[in-house]
Amino acid sequence: MDAEIKHRNSDKTFKFVTPPADSSIEVLNDFYWTDTDEPHVARRKMILQKYPEVTKLTGHEPKTKWYVMGVVLLQLGIAYYLRHTPVFSWKFLTLAYVIGATANQAIFLAIHELSHNLLFRKPLHNKLFAVFANIPIGVPYSASFQPYHQLHHKFLGDMYLDTDLPTEYEGRFLSSMPGKLFFAIFQIFFYALRPMFITQIKFTYVHLVNVVFQLIFDHVMVTCWGWKALGYFIVSTFLAGSLHPCAGHFIAEHYVLNENNVPRHQKIGGTNISKELLPAETYSYYGTLNMLTWNVGYHNEHHDFPYIAWTRLPELRRIAAEFYDPLPQVTSWCGVIWWFIFNDVNTVWNRVKREGKEKHGYRINRLDEN
């Protein structure tokens, strides 16, 4: 059946042929365009209507700060230990991959918790603690992540405001097997650089504090311990966003990977989507790697209730099990990386996308504030 999608504020119309519900999924050469609203607001309303006690799960988690401080101290200790070790030695690279990348992935996701104000009551305290947590990353990152991530939540799938989405150029040039391998190896750079080319945010005093503090700390570290210590931070950061088990969450959260994401109890019609459910664009993972990543695998739960801290997301799933158990789930982050790269049906195009609410290049004012 022929169909069209046109946003009411846009002159552009997308034409496509709607496949039968039971047809097999084919390799894409464009994104999954939709004119429907993202599903999380609707599901949140339904859950709150049936289980109003869920509101008691919201709020900050004070003990998280102690874990974050422990990870920062761990990274500082290893950086000091490796201060005289050659960067390209097996000892250096093994520690950077096994411990450093895992720790820095935890730091990425601690900053993610802080971006939702889930460690302290006051937003400013969360922002400043994120600057401290940023230390092992080696480059200033936390202040920019927060506003872009707020846009990702508020405008999921928006072609201009959700900078988590790959661009058309990425889809066009990186959807082959070598291209996907390149994307998976260097995805940290795509996530770091892509937002600046899509949507500009306001540079605030928090950004300045983040940049100045990180540069001063790096300078002191190099002066006292040498370049290899800082190199440990940088290499750990790169590996944390490369071919690392914990990095699988970057792809697993929102890519429609047809061979891996299946309903918990059955696979219907050879697709990853139950006929009773709307097309899925967010996926949860309930495996053991959640213990190292602040339960970021509970991603449907997180998008439904972004103000519930990581320690209480499993309880949300337990209370509202009938809303979450039937949804397609990711079974393995390592498997996601493998299936994404080597399965032809999974490409960079495999994301749900919506026509933008703002014109390209529009400077965001208050939309990105938490």
Swiss-Prot record:
Location relative to the cell: Membrane
UniProt-listed Pfam families: FA_desaturase, Lipid_DES
CDD domains in UniProt: Delta4-sphingolipid-FADS-like
One record GO biological process: sphingolipid metabolic process
Catalysed reactions listed for this entry: an N-acylsphinganine + 2 Fe(II)-[cytochrome b5] + O2 + 2 H(+) = an N-acylsphing-4-enine + 2 Fe(III)-[cytochrome b5] + 2 H2O
Positions of short motif Histidine box-3: 299-303
One cellular component (GO) term of this entry: membrane
Alphabetized UniProt keyword annotations: Lipid metabolism, Membrane, Oxidoreductase, Sphingolipid metabolism, Transmembrane, Transmembrane helix
Pathways involved: Lipid metabolism; sphingolipid metabolism
InterPro entries noted in UniProt: DES1/DES2, FA_desaturase_dom, Sphingolipid_d4-desaturase_N
Entry's EC annotation: 1.14.19.17
Residue window of motif Histidine box-1: 112-116
Domain of life: Eukaryota
Keyword Transmembrane helix: yes
Transmembrane domains' residue ranges: 68-88, 92-112, 128-148, 173-193, 197-217, 220-240
GO molecular function terms attached to this record: sphingolipid delta-4 desaturase activity
Record's bilayer topology term: Multi-pass membrane protein
Motif Histidine box-2: positions: 149-153
Function: Delta(4)-fatty-acid desaturase which introduces a double bond at the 4-position in the long-chain base (LCB) of ceramides. Required for the formation of the monounsaturated sphingoid base (E)-sphing-4-enine during glucosylceramide (GluCer) biosynthesis.
Family: Belongs to the fatty acid desaturase type 1 family. DEGS subfamily.
PANTHER family: SPHINGOLIPID DELTA 4 DESATURASE/C-4 HYDROXYLASE PROTEIN DES2, SPHINGOLIPID DELTA(4)-DESATURASE DES1
Protein name, UniProt field: Sphingolipid delta(4)-desaturase
